[in-house]
Regions:
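Low-complexity, intrinsically disordered Ser/Thr/Pro- and acidic-rich segments
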Residues: 16, 27-33
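Serine residues within intrinsically disordered or low-complexity segments
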Residues: 4-8, 20, 33, 37
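Domain-level signature for soluble enzymes in the chorismate/prephenate branch of the shikimate pathway
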Residues: 28, 41-322
Length: 322
């Protein structure tokens, strides 16, 4: 892929084959394209005349930043301090899309993001599984034997227990963000401290990787979602995310799941969360391995007859974790 920048525009030039890969996501986001030629006689050129901005929660150099680079490599990343700000920017139109973590294979779901998907006017267009690699990062010149404290997000610290057991003199210090912890130790010139963060954070803030991939479990993945205001469904969509609330009557969950089973629709995920503002009531989140076809539409119509509330959170291509 060749990327050229002119003034405030981002022009992405891709071969026909690559464009066909990205086309469903680009068009689903509501970004227009035009066809030109001349890069090569056998190559079509598709310049996307838009300053594509993508919001993430957290700092530059974070795992969300890394995931956004895989999903929309030419976009300008807009870091946000809070998850609600990410959704505010998407709804307000100051960014065209956002990349959010939704669940980790070890730590589980990001509850706040499920709640925001349910209540905000956004739509899921793509998912991506990022292999999580935790690295010990310090300022240049600092040796491992000088480290007495390590900063990072609590989840990252918890996923590196073996490192702390093998280095009992090093204290784990919870911090608001993995990449933010690198920025902190570099800015403060802390010679007795390090951070646990993605490798990208070291390059972003001028740190140095002391130890690479210190996570306990190498089968550590985070699932990220690409969201926008547009509800256009791109080609190749074969997965649907749904949120629904059921009436409190006997057998209702069985009936709700039966609408999928009766149509041979497979569920890849089901989870319940407390329904905000309604103590002891719950919302169910379900992923089904079907796109916008007749079977799924009939299943959703059937579900609406049973449930008090149904919301389609997104229809998108299923990704592979491995």
């Amino acid at each position: 892929m060749k990327v050229s920048r002119r003034s405030s525009d981002v022009a992405i030039f891709v071969t026909l084959g690559l464009f066909n890969v990205f086309r469903p996501f680009v068009l689903a986001l509501g970004v227009g394209s035009c066809i030109a030629s001349g890069v090569h006689r056998r190559t079509l050129c598709y310049p996307l005349r838009i300053a594509m901005k993508v919001a993430i929660q957290g700092e530059l150099g974070s795992f969300s930043h890394e995931a956004s680079g895989n999903m929309l490599p030419a976009a300008t990343v807009v870091p946000c301090a809070r998850s609600a700000e990410v959704f505010d920017r998407v709804e307000g139109g100051s960014v065209q899309a956002a990349v959010i973590p939704i669940e980790n294979s070890l730590a589980g779901s990001v509850a706040e993001h499920f709640d925001l998907l349910l209540t905000r006017e956004v739509f899921v267009h793509r998912e991506f599984y990022l292999r999580i690699r935790h690295n010990l990062i310090a300022i240049p010149g600092v040796k491992l034997n000088a480290i007495r404290q390590v900063f990072s997000h609590p989840v990252a610290l918890d996923q590196c227990r073996k490192f702390f057991r093998s280095h009992p003199r090093i204290r784990a210090v919870p911090f608001y963000d993995t990449a933010g912890s690198v920025r902190h130790i570099v800015a403060e010139r802390l010679h007795d401290a390090a951070a646990i963060a993605p490798k990208q954070a070291a390059g972003q803030y001028g740190g140095r990787v002391l130890l690479a991939e210190i996570e306990d479990d190498q089968q550590n993945y985070t699932r990220f979602l690409l969201i926008s205001k547009s509800k256009k469904i791109g080609k190749g969509a074969n997965k649907t995310s749904i949120g629904f609330v059921l009436k409190n009557v006997p057998g209702v969950l069985f009936k709700a799941l039966s609408v999928f089973a009766l149509r041979d629709i497979n569920l890849s995920k089901i989870e319940s969360r407390p329904l905000r503002g309604h103590p002891w009531e719950y919302v169910f989140f379900v992923d089904i391995l079907r796109g916008d076809d007749e079977a799924s539409r009939n299943a959703l119509r059937h579900l609406e007859e049973i449930a008090e509330f149904v919301k389609i959170l997104g229809v998108y291509p299923a990704a592979q974790a491995l």
